[in-house]
Amino acid sequence: MRTWIEIDKENLKYNVLKLKEIANNKEILGVVKANAYGLGSIEIAKILKEVEVKLFGVANLEEAIELQEAGIKDKILILGASFEDELVEATKRGVHVAISSMGQLQFLVSKNLNPNIHLKFDTGMTRLGFEVDDAEKVIEYCKNNNLNLVGIFSHLSDSDGNTIETKNFTLEQIEKFKKIVNSLNLEYIHISNSAGITNFHNDILGNLVRLGIGMYSFTGNKKTPYLKNIFTIKSKILFIKKVKKDSFVSYGRHYTLPADSTYAVLPIGYADGLKKYLSKGGYVLINNHRCEIIGNICMDMTMIRVPKEIENSIKIGDEVTVINADILDNLNIPELCVWEFMTGIGRRVKRIIV
């Protein structure tokens, strides 16, 4: 293999159980949308089943069908909005659906469809969801039309923020949600996402928490200290060469070598998910030695500067650690967003469970 990602099964299970403990042992909804944040939705879902995760969250019907066709028979919730034809198919397949508007409810009634419904309320995200003030009317409509209302949920927009203002806003969202669900007895009531679990575990409402990026050891853009690294992107040295000081490296001649150097080429580029912004400040590890990424990252290749202490010991085919949670945590690059990076891991990168 040229480039691959190793997924640590036991560390993933540890992280899920640790976060479940922090969430006062609430039931876990495993969010495996966007190919489980780039790591492989089917593989991750199968691991989560081993720690008693029985409900999975996806973005759309297509992702739900992918899980079902891979043999995942557990409950699946489409967290995003669905088109009318998707609501029809979801009902046939027994997939739970998020409903955010009266128009969707009226469509279900008009077509005599009765899927498992989770009503979504907008407590401050300003994306999808009913208005909080309409809660009583919407819930009453479901009851009067014998709709199968199994859940109510909302989404925290800034629970990974670290200021007093962001904390207060999150608490306001939780309080709004509390007013909706206070006297309800439903199978699924949920508002807490990963950062909601780690940062607001004393304020968790309901009987379910949604666990996504937290499984992979992150709260927001920072690694959670008590969680374990679960993924490592690795590659191999493809080419090695010694060059003179002042040589330009890669497209655009933006980088000039400050001294006579040894550089190596890795068979991974932005087509594989190694973002171009890592050209400034990014690094990889060879035998625990930090090697700076130099020049613009190319579509299929990346150049690194090899430190003098290992330049005579490396060889073509040597293994390179390109990215793991600790490297991402150490990078001081404003453009870096862990979610964006993970979901951008390309299909050429083989996913391997270890």
Swiss-Prot record:
CDD domains to which the protein is assigned, alphabetical: PLPDE_III_AR
Cellular-component GO terms for this entry: cytosol
Keyword Isomerase: yes
GO terms classed as biological process: D-alanine biosynthetic process
Pfam families per UniProt: Ala_racemase_C, Ala_racemase_N
GO molecular function, one term: alanine racemase activity
Alphabetical list of PROSITE patterns matching this protein: ALANINE_RACEMASE
Binding locations of substrate: 127, 299
SMART domains: Ala_racemase_C (SM01005)
Catalytic activity entry: L-alanine = D-alanine
E.C. designation(s): 5.1.1.1
Chain positions found as N6-(pyridoxal phosphate)lysine: 33
Pathway stated in the Swiss-Prot or TrEMBL entry: Amino-acid biosynthesis; D-alanine biosynthesis; D-alanine from L-alanine: step 1/1
Domain of life: Bacteria
Function: Catalyzes the interconversion of L-alanine and D-alanine. May also act on other amino acids.
Family indicated by similarity: Belongs to the alanine racemase family.
Protein name (record): Alanine racemase
Biological source species: Fusobacterium nucleatum subsp. nucleatum (strain ATCC 25586 / DSM 15643 / BCRC 10681 / CIP 101130 / JCM 8532 / KCTC 2640 / LMG 13131 / VPI 4355)
